[in-house]
Amino acid sequence: MTLAKIELLKQLLRDNEAKTVLKQTTVDQYNIIRKFNTSRIERNPSLRMKWAMCSNFPLALTKGDMANRIPLEYKGIRLKTNAEDIGTKGQMCSIAAVTWWNTYGPIGDTEGFEKVYESFFLRKMRLDNATWGRITFGPVERVRKRVLLNPLTKEMPPDEASNVIMEILFPKEAGIPRESTWMHRELIKEKREKLKGTMITPIVLAYMLERELVARRRFLPVAGATSAEFIEMLHCLQGENWRQIYHPGGNKLTESRSQSMIVACRKIVRRSIVASNPLELAVEIANKTVIDTEPLKSCLAAIDGGDVACDIIRAALGLKIRQRQRFGRLELKRISGRGFKNDEEILIGNGTIQKIGIWDGEEEFHVRCGECRGILKKSKMRMEKLLINSAKKEDMKDLIILCMVFSQDTRMFQGVRGEINFLNRAGQLLSPMYQLQRYFLNRSNDLFDQWGYEEPPKASELHGINELMNASDYTLKGVVVTKNVIDDFSSTETEKVSITKNLSLIKRTGEVIMGANDVSELESQAQLMITYDTPKMWEMGTTKELVQNTYQWVLKNLVTLKAQFLLGKEDMFQWDAFEAFESIIPQKMAGQYSGFARAVLKQMRDQEVMKTDQFIKLLPFCFSPPKLRSNGEPYQFLRLMLKGGGENFIEVRKGSPLFSYNPQTEVLTICGRMMSLKGKIEDEERNRSMGNAVLAGFLVSGKYDPDLGDFKTIEELEKLKPGEKANILLYQGKPVKVVKRKRYSALSNDISQGIKRQRMTVESMGWALS
């Protein structure tokens, strides 16, 4: 096709002869005419692309040696033409040429490819190790849901990810890293090491890193599993009338951060609502909470979704939330209408009068409870219509009950037969609407009996539903089940909401969209470690979590605590951190443990035999007022028991699952987590043999003496007379000889002088508790 011919055809188009010319001209040449004669936007680009790809040679080759390697044909299949393309000046090739190139084309240097294209190779690994089941044919109910397209290494907001990528690839040009970037320093360090010396262009590296860090979510029709490992293979797993069973291989990459974030937020909300100022406490705790090594606020900003508790904490921290409304398990999104609230006194079925905020106005909502979705239409104190899809009976039942209660229908108020005085987890009385919600979820028959039944619509795609959640030829009034799919509603828009002192979220219109009472009562175990760096939160955790948090706090403030201890400040035992720890000590034993622990620590100080690991171990037990024997001496213990039984105990003289110490490596192991004491132990202590202060009233006088017989128990030691000797095991099980002191509080002059010198040194250092 020459330019002269194009000009001629242009003239022909203005003439009646154009029709004749066009009839004799091939389609691809006509396509070129249109290309040179119009600039209109293609109305159906997808169809145009499909149509173009059906031609013999739809693709253009660039000029050069690489293009010349593709043969004209392979096994009788034409791969390219000899003719020159007018647009690209190169040759045209078929789609088969792409397959030939991928199969038989040259392979360059692939060093470093697995590091760079890690996400692709992991996908291949999951595919290679996957388990494929049978294909089933038949109607597939697919629901549009917002899903993550591929698994991520670590999800973060796009702007944060771009800073992290700059820090990985161009550390010199990136400048001083922001705090939000430096939080990911472990990831940055790991990626720098991996990509070191890679000869791949930075733009490709940046693209692949973005794929690992930035979430790509789409609103896709899905049946079954929605985790990213399944969604990346969605095209192979289901269609409109077929499904393929598939289980991805390898380790699942789906993040545990999201699950741990939900657990943390639920606990923070539950702890905060019992405070005098819930909002203030929630903000304080949230700002001091870390998931793994990342602040909770960063997780909430990076990770999409979560549950009600996550949105409450987001709002408390000033972050935006997705547009939705909650009423317990019921999730709502307004379709149309507006309501106005007025307080009214309502006579309910049990004869009591309740003051309730009644919503006036016609409103329509998209509703969801678990996997059951529907459309609710309501007016003042009346549920007009509820259209739902088929799902699990439990979800259908809960959705219907919650919509009936949410609509504030008069029949619902009349259905109350018993008392409504439910409490939340904090022991507080719930508001009337939440009382009614709890009541009817427990006693659904009271509601359904009062509600009444009617004939279902005659339409073939609709059917009725009875009180047992079965399809029926009669239906609960206003409730209809559709055989068609109701798509999941997408909450893509975010909005800034205000939050009240009592953790209720309010839109600009004044509408309350969710509150602390909507937070799930479910208790879950976090998949990642959650650290609440505030004692106000620790008592909400398990015994092990409280032990871990308390000892972490002691380690963090060790220098200060040691200084206070050596200065003889007795009020040092009264920290909030130890008050929380007291809640896991059996009440009857708290005073005895305190007297024992204080006596041992005092003896260490008096004799200048500080053992840092023993100091850390016993310090939290000193909070309670000490309880001594009638003779003024402390009780003696080998094991300090904590609440919960099992492994919940601390061994005084050796290691235990909760607390153990390795003096060779100077590493403490708290609940399985290792913490180093390097740099926190003075040389004098490190070089000294085991200290004397193990048991109050006893001194270590030498090594194990076989002439003294077997190791004595605590009970046997107590029977010794002053000056008598015995063998015992101390610390991590070291055998030594001890002697019972003649005077419990005796101090020699040189020890007194030593303590004075030590105190002067500490005072000159100065200290402050972090």
Curated annotation (Swiss-Prot):
It comes from Influenza B virus (strain B/Ann Arbor/1/1966 [wild-type]). The keyword Protein biosynthesis does not apply. One of its GO terms (cellular component) is virion component. Keywords: Cap snatching, Eukaryotic host gene expression shutoff by virus, Eukaryotic host transcription shutoff by virus, Host gene expression shutoff by virus, Host nucleus, Host-virus interaction, Inhibition of host RNA polymerase II by virus, mRNA capping, mRNA processing, Viral transcription, Virion. GO terms for molecular function: RNA binding; RNA-directed RNA polymerase activity. A motif (Nuclear localization signal) lies at residues 740-743. It comes from the Viruses. Plays an essential role in transcription initiation and cap-stealing mechanism, in which cellular capped pre-mRNAs are used to generate primers for viral transcription. Recognizes and binds a wide range of cap structures of target pre-RNAs which are subsequently cleaved after 10-13 nucleotides by the viral protein PA. Plays a role in the initiation of the viral genome replication and modulates the activity of the ribonucleoprotein (RNP) complex. Pfam families: Flu_PB2_1st, Flu_PB2_2nd, Flu_PB2_3rd, Flu_PB2_4th, Flu_PB2_5th, Flu_PB2_6th, Flu_PB2_7th. This is Polymerase basic protein 2. The keyword Ion transport does not apply. Belongs to the influenza viruses PB2 family. Its main location: virion. Influenza RNA polymerase is composed of three subunits: PB1, PB2 and PA. Interacts (via N-terminus) with PB1 (via C-terminus). Interacts with nucleoprotein NP (via N-terminus). One of its GO terms (biological process) is 7-methylguanosine mRNA capping. Gene3D superfamilies: Polymerase Basic Protein 2, C-terminal domain. The gene is PB2. The lineage of its organism: Viruses, Riboviria, Orthornavirae, Negarnaviricota, Polyploviricotina. It is found in: Virion; Host nucleus.
